[in-house]
Regions:
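Pepsin/retropepsin-fold aspartyl endopeptidases
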Residues: 1-123
Length: 123
């Protein structure tokens, strides 16, 4: 299990950030941050998202966008407005936005090779 401190903020107000501890979960698609912290930072939910739990039940959570910062890396990714009982998770979309991947053996984030497909025109 890897837990790291990551800064979270509103992309529209990047000077205002909060430090939070996150469980790094590369198997989770989205990051989860407590709703009260996101709202305090000025981040507003945009849509509702349904999730299927391992026990077969479904839950619904609000989803918005947040700015994430880890050391010198900054990225914007979708974020789930966590409710009571939800863990702070840093998911795959946020890891990719930060250009990082989880090295589970060393329990740290490593640079993610960034690939860009470019179509070159023939001369």
């Amino acid at each position: 299990m890897t837990v790291l401190e990551i800064e979270v903020g509103d992309p529209a107000k990047p000077s205002r950030m909060d430090n939070l501890e996150f469980l790094i979960d590369s198997g989770a698609v989205y990051s989860v941050v407590p709703a009260d912290i996101l709202k305090k930072l000025g981040i507003k939910p945009r849509v509702m998202q349904e999730f299927h739990l391992s026990n077969g039940s479904k839950i619904t959570r609000e989803k918005g966008g947040a700015l994430f910062k880890y050391k010198d890396r900054v990225g914007v990714a979708d974020v789930i407005f966590g409710e009571k009982g939800d863990s702070n998770l840093l998911g795959a979309f946020t890891l990719e936005a930060l250009g990082r991947s989880l090295d589970p053996l060393k329990r740290k984030l490593s640079p993610l090779p960034m690939i860009l497909a470019v179509q070159r025109q023939a001369s």
